[in-house]
């Protein structure tokens, strides 16, 4: 693994060096033509682009008649600036021995690249993306070379089935953006990401090992809606959909968490719904409520998504619907929900208060049924054991011969004639 990694690094450094160097007497990296680069505090060499290498030239600052370096300096077509600083930046002119213009050069100072900061994230279980940023500002034109490879364990079956593990280029999307995307990744595999920062003064590489399970972070849910429940002044119904980027497959589902709060209340209440909707039963009557949701892999892989944009809803101010009893002896008036500021308590309803999406009753019923089933089973086992023991004792009483002296003290025995009286 280490040899493959070092080999990949050597290839990328070679490519970066090729980008920096050229075969002409004045290597041109990229950027505007005629621009050459150096590092502050270091010696900088400028070369005259319009002459043959080694031809003596004279150097001037643009717009200044003062000679900086004459043709007899022995440096040929090059100009040497010792310990360059910001005052040395600008345009330089080189002239041949006959005074003809050899060319113009613009000096720009900056720093070599440092290892970039790289992070990766997967919005689904098939693709992931990596982003990067420079760890220090170089002040020079910068490019990034990005690639990845699949990590394998020596002797693993997966390696025997797929000997090719890369490296492959990680396409930057869009081109030139600080982001690349890996498509068709394997959920249970690990990958090594290589991001190399290149500028005219060198190259620096960052390697990052990632696992799709650990970097999984879905996009937030979409289509969040908050609606009132007619007739229930303390209830709100929230519904949403899966994020469009998450493939709907039965083996890769999402779970959700929902937060809500009344207006002007800073604290959020949190619940974890069982599906794609939730009924809030403790809303504050008459106040608008903010609601938001986030998503996560249902097996807790990765992390929670960011929160969805907030949606707002206000509980219903209508009356609770009532039914007249079948026997018709009780005449009831329409029940009006009291206003929020009214000191009078609400009138009790004659009908049971339904609880939407409240599964506690069903859970209790299941628990009672399970308990009754266990007790019935234990009773049957005890009865079977008692019956078996009784049958065994009865069979033993019929087949076995009585032991000597058994019941002798209870049953009298007639004396034979002539037997002496003891």
Curated annotation (Swiss-Prot):
Residues 335-355 are annotated as: Disordered. GO terms for biological process: developmental process; head development. The chain crosses the membrane at residues 371-391. One of its GO terms (cellular component) is extracellular region. InterPro entries: FN3_dom, FN3_sf, Hematopoietin_rcpt_L_F3_CS, Ig-like_dom, Ig-like_dom_sf, Ig-like_fold, Ig_sub, IL11/IL27_subunit_beta. It comes from Pongo abelii (Sumatran orangutan). Residues 1-22 form the signal peptide. GO terms for molecular function: cytokine receptor activity. Residues 392-422 are cytoplasmic. Receptor for interleukin-11 (IL11). The receptor systems for IL6, LIF, OSM, CNTF, IL11 and CT1 can utilize IL6ST for initiating signal transmission. The IL11/IL11RA/IL6ST complex may be involved in the control of proliferation and/or differentiation of skeletogenic progenitor or other mesenchymal cells. Essential for the normal development of craniofacial bones and teeth. Restricts suture fusion and tooth number. This is Interleukin-11 receptor subunit alpha.
């Amino acid at each position: 693994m280490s040899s493959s990694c070092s080999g990949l690094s050597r290839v990328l450094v070679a490519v970066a060096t090729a980008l920096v160097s050229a075969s002409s007497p004045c290597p041109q990296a990229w950027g505007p033509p005629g621009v050459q680069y150096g590092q502050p505090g270091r010696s900088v060499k400028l070369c005259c682009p319009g002459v043959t290498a080694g031809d003596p030239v004279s150097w001037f600052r643009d717009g200044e008649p003062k000679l900086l370096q004459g043709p007899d300096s022995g440096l040929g077509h090059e100009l040497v600036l010792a310990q360059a600083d910001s005052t040395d930046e600008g345009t330089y002119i080189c002239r041949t021995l006959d005074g003809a213009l050899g060319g113009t050069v613009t000096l720009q100072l900056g720093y070599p690249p440092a290892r970039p900061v790289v992070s990766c994230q997967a919005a689904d279980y098939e693709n992931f993306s990596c982003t990067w940023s420079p760890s220090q500002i170089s002040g020079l034109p910068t490019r990034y070379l990005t690639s990845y490879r699949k990590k394998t364990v020596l002797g693993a079956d997966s390696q025997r089935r797929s000997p090719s593990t890369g490296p492959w280029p990680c396409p930057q999307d869009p081109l030139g953006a600080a982001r690349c995307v890996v498509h068709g990744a394997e959920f249970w595999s690990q990958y090594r990401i290589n991001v190399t920062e290149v500028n005219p003064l060198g190259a620096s590489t960052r390697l990052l090992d990632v696992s799709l399970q650990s970097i999984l972070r879905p996009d937030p849910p979409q289509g969040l809606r908050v609606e009132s429940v007619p007739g229930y002044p303390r209830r709100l119904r929230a519904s949403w959909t899966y994020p469009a980027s998450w493939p709907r497959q039965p083996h890769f589902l999402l779970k959700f968490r929902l937060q809500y709060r009344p207006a002007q209340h800073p604290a959020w209440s949190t619940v974890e719904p069982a599906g794609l909707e939730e009924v809030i039963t403790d809303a504050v009557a008459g106040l608008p409520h903010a609601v938001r949701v986030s998503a996560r892999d249902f097996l807790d892989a990765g992390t929670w998504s960011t929160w969805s944009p907030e949606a707002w809803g206000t509980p219903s101010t209508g009356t609770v619907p009532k039914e007249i009893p079948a026997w018709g002896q009780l005449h009831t008036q329409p029940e009006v929900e009291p206003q929020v500021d009214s000191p009078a308590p609400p009138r009790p309803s004659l009908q049971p208060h339904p609880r939407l999406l409240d599964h506690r009753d069903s859970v209790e019923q299941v628990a009672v049924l399970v308990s009754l089933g266990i007790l019935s089973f234990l009773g049957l086992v005890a009865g079977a054991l008692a019956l078996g023991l009784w049958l065994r004792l009865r069979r033993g009483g019929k087949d076995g011969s009585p032991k000597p002296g058994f019941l002798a003290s209870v049953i009298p025995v007639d004396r034979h004639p002539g037997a002496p009286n003891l």
